[in-house]
């Protein structure tokens, strides 16, 4: 079974509280999503391997450590996932970015794919899938399945808020995918929205309804 990491860092909790507030405007909402993504990135990359290298400082030579040739990919689930990309790229500037467009059918609550663009060598990369919300888990499950069909083997899922139902879905379908969430909420309501949640992340990011 995959590992689920729920963050308890004070900065993340503080920013998440402001993010939830219905009075937080789109500009601040976008900034907070990016900042939370950056903070989460440190834990998501904790298991990255390092290799020794020699570096010369202005004073003398020393042995340092760098990431050991790891090729990375950040894949947002459109459209809300776009809000987390810059936060990850600020820490991982060499990562390539792919895009998977999914929307949730309001009647069936199942994901429908409408767009996909991935790096040519995506199967060689460790992939970080980002989406602010993990509700039913349908979109995340579909995106991960799609990536595996393209040869991806090492995949992590990063969400700002998740419902237990979504985590259960992903763990059942993809027990090899570790999940990282900033906040684990109570449940889904009858409309498939996370409670208490933060509303529609895409609408709040981009100022749409």
UniProtKB/Swiss-Prot annotation:
InterPro entries membership: PRibTrfase_dom, PRTase-like, Upp_B, UPRTase/APRTase, Ura_phspho_trans
E.C. designation(s): 2.4.2.9
UniProt pathway: Pyrimidine metabolism; UMP biosynthesis via salvage pathway; UMP from uracil: step 1/1
Pfam families documented for this protein: UPRTase
Catalytic activity: UMP + diphosphate = 5-phospho-alpha-D-ribose 1-diphosphate + uracil
Ligand binding (uracil): 194, 199-201
Chain residues that bind 5-phospho-alpha-D-ribose 1-diphosphate: 79, 104, 131-139, 200
UniProt KW keywords: Allosteric enzyme, Glycosyltransferase, GTP-binding, Magnesium, Nucleotide-binding, Transferase
One MF annotation (Gene Ontology) recorded for this entry: magnesium ion binding
GO BP annotation list: UMP salvage; uracil salvage
Cofactor note: Binds 1 Mg(2+) ion per subunit. The magnesium is bound as Mg-PRPP.
Activity regulation (record text): Allosterically activated by GTP.
Enzyme class, broadest EC rank: transferase
Record SUPFAM superfamilies: PRTase-like (SSF53271)
Cofactor(s) needed for function: Mg(2+)
NCBIfam families for the chain: PRK00129.1, upp
Function: Catalyzes the conversion of uracil and 5-phospho-alpha-D-ribose 1-diphosphate (PRPP) to UMP and diphosphate.
Entry's family note: Belongs to the UPRTase family.
Protein name according to UniProt: Uracil phosphoribosyltransferase
Species assigned in the record: Finegoldia magna (strain ATCC 29328 / DSM 20472 / WAL 2508)
């Amino acid at each position: 079974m995959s590992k689920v990491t729920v963050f308890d860092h004070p900065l993340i909790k503080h920013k998440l509280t402001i993010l939830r507030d219905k009075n937080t405007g789109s500009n601040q909402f976008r900034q907070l999503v990016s900042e939370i993504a950056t903070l989460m990135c440190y834990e998501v990359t904790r298991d990255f391997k390092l290799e020794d290298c020699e570096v010369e400082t202005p004073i003398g030579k020393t042995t340092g450590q760098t990431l050991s040739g790891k090729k990375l990919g950040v894949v947002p689930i459109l459209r809300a996932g776009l809000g987390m990309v810059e936060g990850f790229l600020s820490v991982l500037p060499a990562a390539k970015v792919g895009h998977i467009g999914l929307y949730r059918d309001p009647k069936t609550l199942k994901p429908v794919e409408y767009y996909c663009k991935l790096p040519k060598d995506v199967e060689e990369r460790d992939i970080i899938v980002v989406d602010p919300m993990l509700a039913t888990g349908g979109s995340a499950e579909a995106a991960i399945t799609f990536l595996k069909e393209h040869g991806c083997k090492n995949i992590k899922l990063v969400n700002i808020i998740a419902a237990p139902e979504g985590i259960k879905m992903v763990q059942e379908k993809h027990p090899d995918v570790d999940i990282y969430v900033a906040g684990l909420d109570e449940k889904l309501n009858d409309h498939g929205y996370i409670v208490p949640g933060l509303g529609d992340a895409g609408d709040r990011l981009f100022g749409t309804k």
